[in-house]
UniProtKB/Swiss-Prot annotation:
Localization in the cell: Cell inner membrane
Topology, Cytoplasmic side: 1-75, 142-269, 332-350, 404-427
Superkingdom per UniProt: Bacteria
Record-linked Pfam families: PqiA
TM stretches of this protein: 76-96, 121-141, 270-290, 311-331, 351-371, 383-403
Membrane topology reported for the UniProt record: Multi-pass membrane protein
Name of the protein described by the UniProt record: Lipophilic envelope-spanning tunnel protein A
Length: 427
């Protein structure tokens, strides 16, 4: 018995066209964080690309023209004298008006014999932002004059995390709450300039795509075929072959399989920071003279006294001054041990922890910024005066060393310790 099946006739004509040209192939790229070699397709503007294995951002879609970056830099340069030299806060102490600005706080630190601690604050609040705007201006002028731009481009990517104007702005709020127990506070004209400078700096850093600047100024022929001998440069993120001198053909720094002496430098910085954190938390970090009496505060006791007036601000200072430094030390110690013992479990967790400490590390400088600003506000000789204690130097040095330890660690070593050939990683 035959089955009668109805015929289905399409209502619209289906047209099949042959592909007349070869589909576009992607360029081969190595991930600078996990060293995976993959094919990167062509990316349009405002599109980002991520590593298929570790999800690290390979290409950032946010990109401004150099002219727009230069305009932002010149605007920031105009704001800087007002943000640093004009009063941020006014207080009335014992019937006398006192003005506080950024430069005055750094000068008070240096004047009291601790120039190293003052230079830490100076670099993060004044030096690094000033280098940022002058570097962008150098790129703008240098591109037109045919100057060598490689050193500036190499420095810009590392400079971003040292620009800490946003953290200093939080420190202004913390210092205001600490001082309000002794005097009446009012915002100064410099505060508005400083807030504007923070906003412009944040926007500029978020749109400063150094890798795209490398592509514009020093374009290189990408690798179009897969080759395990391809290496990625950690300076400019170019994937290719080393030249005859073993250097990256684009930025001219040595092109090595792994960062040289990464573990040794990381261990040295980490152990030194552990040693410095002990006096930083045991010795007094601030000293207040009130009517001839002397009151010393460690980091913890200062947080407890701050909690009596504002528990939320005390929580912020606790996280930045105690929780973050010790968390960074514990995480980095764990990561280094996992590399030495070739741990194969929990790779995803370790990668996330490394990215976390990379982002939060700079916030530990908050305590030094609060001390710097408070020193310029309260300084009335023996009637009422505020000065920093010996722990300030140890704390600042420990924070900087932990930042350097994270920067010096080559994250690809975590993958080397893991089993080879993993296309995915999980716990």
């Amino acid at each position: 018995m035959a089955l009668n099946t109805p015929q289905i006739t399409p209502t619209k004509k289906i047209t099949v066209r042959a592909i007349g040209e070869e589909l576009p192939r992607g360029d081969y790229q190595r991930c600078p964080q996990c060293d995976m070699l993959f094919s990167l397709p062509e990316i349009n503007s405002h599109q980002s690309a991520y590593c298929p294995r570790c999800q690290a951002k390979i290409r950032d879609g946010r990109d401004w023209s150099l002219t727009r970056l230069a305009a932002m830099a010149f605007t920031m340069l105009l704001l800087m004298p007002f943000a640093w030299g004009e009063p941020l806060l006014h207080i009335w102490l014992l019937g006398i008006r006192i003005d506080a600005n950024v430069m005055q706080g750094i000068w008070q630190m240096t004047k009291q014999g601790d120039a190293i601690t003052g230079s830490m604050v100076f670099f993060c609040v004044i030096g690094a932002p000033l280098i940022l705007v002058t570097s962008i201006a150098y790129l703008w002028f240098g591109n037109r004059l045919g100057m060598n731009l490689r050193p500036v481009l190499l420095m810009l990517e590392r400079l971003k995390e040292w620009v800490m104007l946003d953290i200093y702005l939080v420190g202004i709020g913390v210092a205001s709450i600490k001082v309000q127990d002794y005097a009446h506070i009012q915002a100064g004209v410099g505060l508005f300039s400083f807030v504007a400078l923070v906003i412009l700096t944040t926007v500029t850093l978020s749109h400063l795509n150094v890798e795209e600047l490398w592509e514009r100024f020093y374009p290189q022929r990408p690798a179009t075929r897969r080759d395990e001998k391809l290496r990625v440069c950690l300076g400019c993120h170019f994937t290719g072959y080393p030249d005859q001198r073993g250097r990256c053909p684009r930025c001219h720094i040595p092109l090595r399989l792994r960062r040289r002496h990464s573990l040794q430098k990381c261990w040295a910085a980490l152990l030194a920071s552990i040693v410095l954190l002990l006096p930083a938390n045991l010795l007094p970090i601030s000293i207040i003279y009130l009517n001839g009496g002397r009151q010393e505060d460690t980091i913890l006791s200062g947080i407890m006294s701050l909690a009596s007036s504002n528990i939320a601000v005390a929580g912020i200072v606790f996280i930045a001054s105690i929780l973050v430094p010790f968390t960074k030390v514990i995480v980095m110690f764990t990561l280094l041990l996992s590399i030495h013992f070739k741990c194969q479990q929990g790779l995803r967790t370790r990668i996330l922890l490394l990215r976390m400490v990379t982002w939060i590390g700079r916030w530990s400088m908050l305590d030094l910024f609060v001390i710097s600003l408070t020193m310029s506000l309260i300084n009335r000789d023996q009637i009422l005066a505020f000065t920093m204690g010996p722990a300030a130097f140890y704390f600042g040095a420990a924070v900087i060393l932990t930042i350097l330890a994270v920067e010096w660690l080559d994250s690809r070593l975590l993958w080397d310790a893991h089993e080879s050939g993993n296309a995915r990683f999980d716990d």
